[in-house]
A protein has these predicted regions:
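C-terminal segment of N-terminal export signals and the immediately downstream linker at the start
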Residues: 43-83, 88
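A conserved FAD-binding loop/helix module that cradles the flavin
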Residues: 396-426, 430
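FAD-binding core/adjacent interface of flavoenzyme oxidoreductases
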Residues: 21-37, 42-59, 131-244, 248, ...
């Protein structure tokens, strides 16, 4: 059908759903403050057309490591912005542009895997060279990248967009390291069976839906069951996803009439539901209304898949002796292992940069970001702080927050503008303000659209209370955001 056909189909479905509510698409967009559907179409605005018409004459060999959403979108925008682009992408996965935000919908039985998996070759911009290989070593001192196949690739400018890896092996009892686009055989030995699930890769999302149906079936026998949901002690992509799948489980259990038979419990490593107070407060109220339980400061460290027991490291502070210097009591960090039974557990794995990045001089050398091996870039310009011809964006970039597709939509414009400025010998003036968006699915038919930046304040794009669950955001999530991403962002226009 093609991308435009996919978009038309999505908008037709959107119209049908809106008609059930007695409103038109135009009225819905007006309500949401969108004005028109042009933002979905990926249409080139007059300003963008002018930019393309006056494309930069700057020259240089650009190497992009990573052919996912961030890498290909950046390649497309650079191709549109340079008169004679010389761009190469290194990417080993033939399905690297899978629509990751849809994995929660697959896990909730709303979509199928076929709705989120795409062929990378269909999105490579014209004129861009694609190398099907994996970066093994970065040599920024000599402007080279060495692949696993032994090829040495030189560059004038490097963009690191490798994404991150899912390190299930950091949890005792689980095995393997994978990506959102693919999971190795080690991971599948333990995940996706015996009640242990994870939506963070495509097949895992499929198996989660199967596991959820099995949970419902068992609950219908009258048994009292326990479902656990985790959030690790590392930065993760889409911080709302561990809660989204919990909300969807709640919705499906209610739909089946067996919600009272299953206790749903969330065990995050952190001490809040969300880093933005307004969204934290809203989520707490939603949890209370749904009788979903939670306990902070719990990090999953081990699973026994045979006995269905999860072991958490629980942390807290205890008051010690009085310190006369600070005129307060000393607070002593405490911890202990806590074992919890489960019938169903959703595991959000620890995440980190790929080994090639983590073990290179591109990674942060000190501070909290060094633990995960994230690329050391200026959080505003996305330029490497030590290697000025290197940039990074997306999940692998060592910036606060920013591990969502919505972040990439802001980041890649900043990166392209700054890279071209560098190529032209100009000052880097474009700044990324930390924008992140999380369409937090709270049920079948409701979404809270959480937008924010480094101020940790809501930054809504629309004139509506962002802490309220709305049907219009469900329509946006289910029918509109995918075509905007696939047709708009991946073409460098959204």
């Amino acid at each position: 059908m093609g991308h435009k056909g996919d978009l038309k189909k999505a908008l037709d479905i959107l119209d049908t759903e809106l008609k059930k509510k007695g409103i038109s698409r135009r009225e819905a967009f007006k309500l949401a403050g969108l004005g028109s559907a042009s933002f979905l179409m990926g249409n080139t605005t007059e300003a963008e057309a002018a930019t393309v018409a006056s494309a930069s004459e700057a020259k240089g060999k650009i190497l992009i490591v990573g052919g996912g959403l961030a890498g290909i979108s950046t390649a497309a925008r650079l191709s549109n912005s340079l008169s004679t682009p010389d761009i190469t992408i290194i990417e080993p996965n033939l399905e690297s542009v899978s629509y990751q935000p849809g994995q929660t919908l697959v896990a909730g039985g709303v979509w199928d895997k076929s709705d989120i998996v795409y062929q990378t070759k269909d999105f490579i911009p014209s004129g861009v060279k694609m190398i099907k290989d994996k970066a093994k070593e970065f040599d920024p001192e000599n402007n080279k990248v060495i692949t696993e196949g032994g090829e040495v690739i030189s560059y004038d400018y490097l963009i690191v967009a490798t994404g991150l890896v899912l390190d299930f092996g950091m949890i005792k009892g689980l095995e393997g390291v994978g990506t959102s686009a693919s999971a190795n055989s080690e991971i599948s030995k333990k995940i996706g069976k015996n009640g242990v699930h994870s939506i963070y890769y495509a097949d895992g999302a499929v198996n989660t839906w199967t596991g959820m149906q099995e949970l419902i079936k068992e609950a219908k026998t009258g048994k009292n069951l326990k479902a656990l949901y985790t959030h690790p002690n590392t930065p993760i992509k889409c911080g709302g996803a561990p809660k989204k799948i919990m909300y969807l489980t709640d919705a499906r259990l209610r739909e089946a009439g067996v919600r009272d038979n299953v206790e749903l419990s969330f065990y995050p490593n952190g001490g809040t539901m969300f880093g933005v107070p307004e969204y934290h407060d809203a989520i707490v109220k939603q949890f209370e209304a749904r009788d979903m339980k939670w306990e902070y400061k719990n990090n999953l460290v081990e699973i026994d898949v045979n006995t269905k027991k999860a072991i958490f490291e629980k942390r807290w502070l205890e008051k010690g002796v009085y310190d006369e210097d600070i005129e307060d009591y000393e607070m002593i960090p405490m911890s202990k292992k806590v074992e919890r039974d489960y019938d169903f557990i959703h595991v959000t794995p620890p995440m980190r940069a790929p080994d090639a990045v983590k073990n290179s001089s591109l990674a942060w050398q000190k501070g909290s970001a060094s633990k995960g091996g994230w690329v050391e870039v200026d959080k505003e310009t996305l330029q490497h702080t030590r290697y000025k011809n290197v940039f990074a964006l997306g999940d692998v970039a060592g910036v606060p927050m920013g591990k969502t597709g919505g972040s990439v939509r802001k980041q890649y414009k900043v990166l392209v503008e700054n890279l071209i400025s560098l190529m032209e010998g100009k000052e880097l003036t474009s700044k990324y303000a930390g924008y992140t968006v999380c369409p937090l699915i709270t049920g079948i038919g409701t979404v809270m659209l959480a937008e924010f930046n480094w101020t940790r304040k809501p930054t809504p794009s629309f004139p509506l209370d962002p802490s309220v669950e709305r049907y219009i955001w469900w329509l946006l999530k289910v029918y509109a955001l995918k075509p905007m991403t696939i047709y708009g962002l991946l073409s460098g226009k959204a």
